[in-house]
Swiss-Prot record:
Glycan-bearing residues: N72
Biological classification of the source: Eukaryota, Metazoa, Chordata, Craniata, Vertebrata
Gene3D superfamilies in alphabetical order: Collagenase (Catalytic Domain)
Catalyses which reaction(s): Cleavage of 3-Asn-|-Gln-4, 10-His-|-Leu-11 and 14-Ala-|-Leu-15 in the insulin B chain, and the bond Z-Gly-Pro-|-Leu-Gly-Pro in a small molecule substrate of microbial collagenase
Keyword tags: Disulfide bond, Glycoprotein, Hydrolase, Metal-binding, Metalloprotease, Protease, Pyrrolidone carboxylic acid, Secreted, Zinc
Organism per entry: Protobothrops flavoviridis
Recorded GO CC terms: extracellular region; plasma membrane
InterPro entries in the cross-refs: MetalloPept_cat_dom_sf, Peptidase_M12B, Reprolysin_adamalysin
Protein name: Snake venom metalloproteinase trimerelysin-2
Cofactor (UniProt): Zn(2+)
GO biological process: proteolysis
Pfam families in alphabetical order: Reprolysin
Length: 201
């Protein structure tokens, strides 16, 4: 399967709780986020998607939305904030919020399916739940996958243990997308052809 080249200009926002979690050390957070983006890039390379971090905003003074442990509420607030505030400051294709808040229902991430390029829906929420940066990167890769039209791997149809779009994260997640995920992405491209990811940054 050969995929056309696409480029995602990603904005990552770090909430105030995460800023405090890393002892208000912005440099430490920057290093962590850059490592995360490197991992995400590696996982998307087989799909011919290049991810660039085009903005990193750290909410060092206070949260600019109310971050609640109800992930769907926080995701909706963040989507509204992206549309009304962030996009007016700087263009981006997609924005993800990294939070130190413990999300409800054993959730470690949430994103709108097929949201890519939509002003309000091209967002994700990821909990910085593990000291291991790769584990958090896999979660963001998973949530970006939803933005790109991917469903969870069906246990029967997708023979892929611990692949990125598995509905539960494994202790040793793989760096691979299942064939199902690749097909979902191909379908999304064909059906919607999201324009914002066509241009190189």
């Amino acid at each position: 399967q050969r995929f056309p080249q696409r480029y995602i200009e990603l904005a990552i926002v770090v909430d105030h709780g995460m800023y405090k979690k890393y002892n208000q050390n912005s440099d430490k957070i920057k290093v962590r986020v850059h490592q995360m983006v490197n991992h995400i890039n590696e996982m998307y390379r087989p799909l011919n998607i290049a991810i660039s971090l085009n903005r990193l905003q750290i909410w060092s003074k206070k949260d600019l939305i109310t971050v609640k442990s109800a992930s769907n509420v926080t995701l909706e607030s963040f989507g509204n904030w992206r549309e009304t505030v962030l996009l007016k400051q700087q263009n981006n294709d997609c924005a993800h919020l990294l939070t130190a808040t413990n999300l409800n229902d054993n959730t470690i991430g949430l994103a709108y399916k097929k949201g890519m390029c939509n002003p309000k829906l091209s967002v994700g929420l990821v909990q910085d739940y593990s000291p291991n940066v790769f584990m958090v990167a896999v979660t963001m890769t998973h949530e970006l996958g939803h933005n790109l039209g991917m469903e969870h791997d069906d246990k029967d149809k997708c023979k892929c243990e611990a692949c990125i779009m598995s509905d539960v994260i494994s202790d040793k997640p793989s760096k691979l997308f299942s064939d199902c995920s690749k097909n979902d992405y191909q379908t999304f491209l064909t059906k919607y052809n999201p324009q914002c990811i066509l241009n190189a940054p």
